Swiss-Prot record:
It comes from the Eukaryota. This is WAT1-related protein At1g11460. It is found in: Membrane. GO terms for molecular function: transmembrane transporter activity.
């Protein structure tokens, strides 16, 4: 009887694992495609607004069908919480993340997102939810070591771009030119800074979402409500770059396709799958799967979009992922203690 229960428990974990893996592979392709769309010159927050609006349209009927009988009463406090959730996890995060992506690459963007567990750990120390005393244990020391390796990898890919690695089909316009190398370096550093700010906002969103999901456990309607607020927030943030209404009229078929794909897969399905994954597998396990997006983005960038990669990005990404898994190893030992 006990053995049967263990088999059922193991088998019940496979669906969320498979969904998370597929989700992260898709996220890697989303980042690579959005980067290509940004290179066309579209306002990054207009892409963000359309992407999130599509997400809310997709999720609204799903939420109504699956959750209409269990949705809790929506109070003013819950509305404010979803407004903040939209700000941290969607609009403000995308403002910095997409701006950073436009200056760097999908590989760098996914690598810096791998810093998320380490940043969350640092916030936990600052907010005293992680006890300082626990740092003296073996698990605590491993977590600190993993955090340091993570940050070192991120710093390496930020400050060392290195020579490009291209294949025979790499686009020549994407390759660096000596006459504007200083400008490229400045943009690269700015891009990494913006991506780091975006990752910090995602970390804060995850901490905030942990509390919100207890008060409002309906994942589809919660994500939909968050997306509605975030779409309006993105529209306001788009004024930072342009106030011309014509910029909202997109006639490039590739960009339209990317926005739809990013809205359905990268925003709606990805947010729901991560929320479900955290609930079923735990935040640590979900964090361990997230580097798959980095591998997916790199392969999609290099093989399909023929974008050159940089040595610094590859070495820094390996360092960041190594640090992530060292950190997760320490976290696992901490949970077992």
């Amino acid at each position: 009887m006990g053995e049967d229960m263990r088999v059922v428990k193991v088998e019940s974990k496979w669906p969320p694992i498979i969904v998370m893996v597929i989700s992260q592979v898709a996220m890697g392709s989303v980042n690579a495609l959005v980067k290509k769309a940004l290179d066309v010159g579209v306002n990054h927050m207009i892409i963000g607004a359309y992407r999130i609006a599509i997400s809310s349209f997709i999720l609204a009927p799903i939420a109504y069908i699956l959750e209409r009988e269990i949705i809790p009463e929506i109070t003013f406090r819950l509305m404010v919480d979803h407004f903040i959730s939209g700000l941290l996890g969607a609009s403000l995060m995308q403002f910095f993340y997409l701006l950073g992506l436009s200056y760097t690459s999908a590989t760098v963007a996914c690598a810096l997102v791998s810093l998320m567990p380490a940043i969350t750990f640092a916030f936990a120390l600052i907010l005293r939810t992680e006890k300082i005393k626990s740092l003296r244990t073996q698990a605590g020391m491993i977590k600190v070591m993993g955090t340091i390796i993570c940050i070192s990898g991120a710093l390496f890919l930020t400050f060392y771009k290195g020579p490009h690695i291209s294949n025979s089909h790499s686009h020549q316009e994407a390759l660096p030119h000596n006459n504007n190398s200083d400008h490229n370096t400045k943009n690269w550093l700015l891009g990494c800074l913006y991506l780091t700010i975006g990752t910090v906002l995602i970390s804060l969103w995850i901490l905030f979402q942990g509390t919100l999901s207890i008060k409002y456990p309906c994942k589809f309607s919660s994500t939909c409500l968050m997306s509605i607020f975030a779409a309006f927030q993105c529209a306001l943030l788009s004024l930072y770059k342009s106030r011309d209404v014509k910029d909202w009229i997109i006639d490039d078929r590739f960009v339209i396709g990317v926005i739809v794909y990013a809205g359905v897969i990268g925003q709606a399905m990805s947010t729901v799958s991560v929320t479900w994954g955290v609930k079923k597998l735990g935040a640590v396990f979900v964090s361990a799967i997230m580097p798959i997006a980095l591998i997916s983005a790199s392969l999609f960038d290099f093989i399909i979009l023929h974008t050159p990669l940089y040595l610094g990005s590859l070495i820094g990404s390996v360092g960041t992922i190594t640090g992530l898994y060292v950190f997760l190893w320490g976290k696992n030992k901490d949970m077992e203690a």
